[in-house]
UniProtKB/Swiss-Prot annotation:
Transmembrane domains' residue ranges: none
GO biological process: protein secretion
InterPro entries: EspC
Role according to the record: May be involved in assembly of the ESX-1 / type VII specialized secretion system (T7SS), which exports several proteins including EsxA and EsxB. Involved in DNA conjugation, in at least recipient strain.
A Pfam family this chain is assigned to: T7SS_ESX_EspC
Upper taxonomic lineage: Bacteria, Bacillati, Actinomycetota, Actinomycetes, Mycobacteriales
Protein name, as recorded: Uncharacterized EspC-like protein D806_0056
Any further remark recorded for this protein: DNA conjugation in M.smegmatis is unidirectional with distinct donor and recipient strains; mc(2)155 is a donor strain while MKD8 is a recipient strain. Mutations in a donor strain that alter DNA transfer do not always alter DNA transfer in a recipient strain.
Observed phenotype of the null mutant: Loss of DNA conjugation when disrupted in recipient strain, strain does not secrete EsxB.
Family classification: Belongs to the EspC family.
Length: 105
């Protein structure tokens, strides 16, 4: 196993895109159950209000967790994209510097 660290901007951008897709899917999944408590109250009437209140509490907790995960994925997407840009600029700058030090034949 090699101890060399190899970083490619393409791989960082690929990982960034995956985090962006994950954030979008998490946002969609988080919203899927919105309104279940209201529907329960509407379809089952006052007898279901205790259950509907419990469902509402679970929905709030689920929404908070989902929103937190979306935020983390979005932040990671941004950080990976920023890192890719920095690696690209560093590679380009150092390549130019190296080209300047090599004497033509």
């Amino acid at each position: 196993m090699s101890d060399d660290l190899r970083v490619t901007t393409a791989h960082l951008r690929e990982l960034s895109a995956k985090q962006g897709r994950a954030a979008a899917e998490l946002a969609t999944a988080t919203a899927v159950v919105d309104g279940v408590d209201t529907a329960l109250r509407f379809t089952h009437g006052p007898i279901s209000w205790g259950t509907a209140a419990a469902v509402e509490a679970v929905q709030h907790a689920r929404r908070a967790a989902g929103t937190g995960m979306v935020k983390v994925s979005q932040e990671l997407e941004t950080k990976l994209d920023t890192a890719a840009g920095r690696y690209h600029r560093t590679d380009s700058t150092m390549g130019d510097a190296l080209d300047e030090t090599i004497q033509p034949r």
